[in-house]
Regions:
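Core catalytic alpha/beta fold that binds nucleotide/phospho-ligands
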Residues: 1-121
Length: 121
């Protein structure tokens, strides 16, 4: 059963200046995510915007707002490049064992993320 849907948009140009802001990066992203962002070269700002939007979309799908440390939500990619979440801490508690599906896209200077929360009633 679908229990929640979250959608977030993030302006890519807003994130360009954040690529070298270690305080920002370390506050909101895991070390693996920061490494992933920096590995994207010319696409680093769009990757950063997509990851940030993905975290915000999860908060909306949970229906709690940001009631957890954003580093408790790690966006990862499988072997085929599909994005997904690894939750820990308060985010994992709020999820209550539910599953989350994530889609991220970039176009027209924007990054968009959709998160669908699936679980039992």
């Amino acid at each position: 059963m679908i229990k929640g849907v979250g959608l977030d948009l993030c302006e890519i140009s807003r994130m360009e200046g954040k690529l070298t802001d270690e305080r920002f990066l370390n506050r909101f992203f895991t070390s693996d995510e920061v490494s992933y962002i920096h590995s994207k070269g010319k696409c680093a700002a769009q990757t950063l915007a997509g990851l940030f939007a993905a975290k915000e979309a999860l908060a909306k799908a949970l229906g709690t707002g940001i009631a957890f440390d954003l580093k408790d939500v790690s966006v990862r990619h499988d072997e085929a490049g599909r994005p997904g979440y690894t939750l820990s801490g308060r985010a994992e508690q709020l999820a209550g064992g539910d599953r989350f599906h994530l889609s991220v896209s970039h176009d027209g200077g924007m990054a968009a993320a959709v998160c669908i929360r699936e679980g039992e009633e």
